[in-house]
């Protein structure tokens, strides 16, 4: 094919859609031209390889889900606890009607392929796993890597990490604690840090059934407030763009 034909085949015009672009203050009916995967200006009469009628639809950048459990040990546990979720009415898994899709299954805890397909149908292009254990990071990344279409990343959990709590309990200097946070982010290939019931998950191992914000951990004698403040300061000094992701105290 000649160069002109290749340009034609790689070009798309999205017509009649409501274009929303908050970054540039755009909220109007407008056509969008695409060539080689990039938005370009097309002449209204220019021939294109494909035209999409987006009447009644919103045209905008892909959605980003900052908190979605899509990888790691908790997903496998959910699938084990929901065997009935893998099949509809106990029938074999139906083959997808879309020729671009491979067979997958699940609704409450879907397989990786189904996760990517369902997100794409909703207009999302990125999702982030917010609860990755450092020891489980390799598995979490491999599972997310098997999820099609979606860009992905994860936040590593440190609020009840035993070594982190030990450093606080021993009164180690802040630079040492900060460096441990930075090392954990790097080693686990995380994009940020999350705490879930800070200190409380560890405290439960010592039969401490609740841990309020200013209540001391039964073993390590540190409080959730200290944990949160230390991690927030560490992330700020490390220059991590995403702030500390917090799941509050005594929540399920």
Protein language model regions, located:
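Short, Lys/Arg-enriched N-terminal segments with co-localized hydrophobic residues
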Residues: 1-8
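Hydrophobic faces of well-ordered beta-strands that scaffold small-molecule active sites
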Residues: 62-66, 127-129, 152-156, 191-195, ...
